[in-house]
């Protein structure tokens, strides 16, 4: 398979996303027990990050299946608004510099601190939502028990 790069040294789809202000990056690393994929999405100066647990080492087909089928659902279910990024827009990157940056990224296996912060915010939002749902369920069950108790008391005194 051959990939054709434009004269700027970047894949053409990257330029489209960069002009729109959207950049996505998938990092897959081994955390000591499982293989984890972290998707970082930069959209209009805000970073959102999503964590996906692959389990055993993913094959290329599994990664593609995740990107094509599960990634959009995971992004749609997210409730976080993202972490504001500070910085300016980059200019066109020299192809040699881009190649050095790519090799540096490949050596640096891990997640950025901003991505970790975004994942933490998403986790906190989910916790709060689940806590609220559980509280409503407990109150509903408590109300049902109270009504049943009232019914039994009325039934008991009805015959006198």
UniProtKB/Swiss-Prot annotation:
Induction: Up-regulated by mannose. Is under the control of ManR. Is subject to carbon catabolite repression (CCR) by glucose. Forms part of an operon with manP and manA. This is Uncharacterized protein YjdF. Keywords: Coiled coil. Pfam families: DUF2992 (PF11208). It comes from the Bacteria. InterPro entries: UCP021328 (IPR016787). The gene is yjdF. Disruption phenotype: Deletion of this gene has no effect on mannose utilization. Residues 133-146 have a biased composition (Basic and acidic residues). Residues 82-109, 129-160 are annotated as: Disordered. The keyword rRNA-binding does not apply. The keyword Phosphoprotein does not apply. Residues 69-145 form a coiled coil. The lineage of its organism: Bacteria, Bacillati, Bacillota, Bacilli, Bacillales. Residues 86-99, 147-160 have a biased composition (Basic residues).
């Amino acid at each position: 398979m051959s990939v054709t790069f434009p004269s700027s040294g970047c894949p053409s789809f990257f330029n489209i996303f960069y002009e729109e202000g959207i950049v996505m990056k998938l990092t897959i690393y081994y955390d000591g027990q499982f293989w984890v994929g972290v998707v970082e999405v930069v959209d209009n100066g805000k970073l959102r990050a999503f964590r996906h647990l692959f389990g055993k080492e993913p094959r290329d087909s599994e990664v593609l299946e995740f990107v094509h089928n599960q990634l959009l659902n995971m992004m749609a279910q997210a409730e976080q608004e993202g972490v504001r990024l500070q910085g300016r827009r980059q200019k066109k990157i020299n192809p040699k510099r881009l190649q050095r940056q790519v090799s540096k990224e490949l050596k640096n296996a891990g997640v950025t601190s901003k991505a970790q912060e975004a994942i933490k915010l998403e986790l906190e939002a989910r916790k709060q939502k689940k806590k609220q749902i559980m509280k409503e369920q407990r109150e509903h069950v408590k109300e049902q028990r109270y009504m049943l108790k009232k019914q039994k008391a009325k039934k008991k005194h009805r015959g006198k």
